[in-house]
């Protein structure tokens, strides 16, 4: 791989595209030649090892200062690592326990909370969203349509990825759970499955009086200790990282959760073990939304769902100007890839919102490795 290449905003886009294509093709050719075609499960460790050997080259190509990664199989971490730096200036290495802003992977937590409300009989997905809140862009849209990114224009007619509209689900979670969104995340997900290095909002490093009242002092102390280790935010300019600003530090249904790849591996295991909801409810969440035309959307209920060379993929990405993330589940193979970065390099150059995870070189190489 062309490990020495760097990207900069002023570079020719076609040159960047060719560089990425060369990097991805190199990975795929090497993986495919070593393990042609579908392979028995016993070869998985070798295929995963081959994939991980190329993560550093992909990180450099993407302009990511620090990358943390974990791969799970059947509920357990089989590989984890950190590449580059969580703090470039202080030379603090990225690690599996490094906290990051996970951006829109937060949306999958929103899906989980709402589906828990459905199971408890406290939420009707097909009720107008105005039933639960008045702060909505389209009061005639249903909760399901907003959760499925299909509330734009004529509700239910088109898919359009829109994080701002998704935020309308924040008060819906509060209405059906009886507590604020951040408390619901903490109680129903983080505390429930032991995600001790995750925090429901970076603003809890200096909480308001209202936020302080929602958590006991010991919990707030733990949150502050986690946030003291959070990766620094960077933008990549002229081939190098420049320290920048953190995204807005609050949390809502669309973004704001802080976590680590280890904690997200716990989340992944809990999903697969149906700790957070029943298998039948999870199936509903992972069923692509059917648009008014009858066509399936690439988005289900808070998750992307599609077919790949490795079978079905259930996934989500996240993107801020200074952070990015990817959680890619391949249920037919029983494996999951989790990536967190302190720049936008995992997401910004790839049209992931269109619903094809394979446009990501990281995802494409992983799919080829485990297919």
Q: What is each PLM-predicted segment?
A:
Residues 8-23:
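Bacterial N-terminal signal peptides that target proteins for export
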Residues 55-58, 69, 75, 98-126, ...:
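Active-site SXXK
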Residues 33-81, 179, 186-187, 191, ...:
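Catalytic loop of the DD-peptidase/beta-lactamase superfamily, centered on the K-T-G motif
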């Amino acid at each position: 791989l062309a490990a020495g290449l760097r990207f900069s905003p002023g570079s020719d886009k076609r040159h960047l595209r060719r560089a990425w294509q060369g990097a991805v093709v190199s990975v795929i050719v090497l993986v495919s030649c070593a393990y042609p075609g579908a392979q028995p499960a016993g070869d998985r460790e070798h295929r995963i090892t081959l994939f991980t050997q190329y993560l550093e080259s992909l990180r450099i190509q993407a302009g990511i200062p620090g990358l943390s990664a974990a791969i799970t199989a059947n509920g357990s971490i089989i590989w984890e690592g950190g590449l580059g730096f969580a703090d470039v200036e202080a030379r603090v290495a990225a690690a599996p326990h490094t906290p990051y802003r996970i951006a829109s992977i937060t949306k999958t937590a929103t899906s989980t909370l709402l589906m828990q409300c459905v199971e408890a009989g406290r939420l009707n997905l097909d009720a107008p969203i105005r039933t639960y809140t008045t702060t909505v862009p389209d009061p005639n849209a249903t909760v399901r349509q907003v959760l499925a990114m299909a509330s734009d224009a004529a509700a239910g007619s088109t898919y359009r990825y829109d994080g701002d509209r998704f935020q309308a689900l924040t008060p819906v979670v509060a209405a059906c759970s009886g507590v604020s969104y951040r408390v619901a995340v903490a109680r129903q997900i983080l505390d429930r499955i032991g995600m001790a290095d995750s925090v429901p909002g970076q603003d809890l490093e200096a909480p308001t009086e209202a936020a302080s009242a929602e958590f006991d002092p010991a919990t707030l102390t733990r949150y502050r200790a986690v946030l003291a280790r959070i990766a620094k935010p960077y933008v990549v300019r002229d081939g190098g990282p420049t320290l920048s600003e953190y995204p807005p530090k609050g949390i809502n249904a669309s973004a704001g959760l802080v976590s680590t790849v280890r904690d997200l591996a716990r989340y992944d295991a809990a999903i697969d073990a149906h700790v957070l909801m029943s298998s039948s409810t999870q199936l509903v969440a992972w069923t692509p939304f059917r648009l008014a035309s009858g066509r399936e959307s690439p988005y289900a209920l808070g998750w992307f769902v599609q077919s790949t060379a490795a079978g079905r993929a259930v996934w989500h990405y996240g993107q801020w100007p200074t952070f990015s993330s990817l959680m890619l589940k391949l249920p037919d193979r029983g494996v999951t890839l989790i990536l967190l970065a302190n720049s936008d390099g995992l997401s910004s150059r790839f049209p992931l919102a269109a619903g094809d995870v394979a446009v990501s070189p990281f995802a494409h190489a992983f799919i080829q490795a485990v297919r």
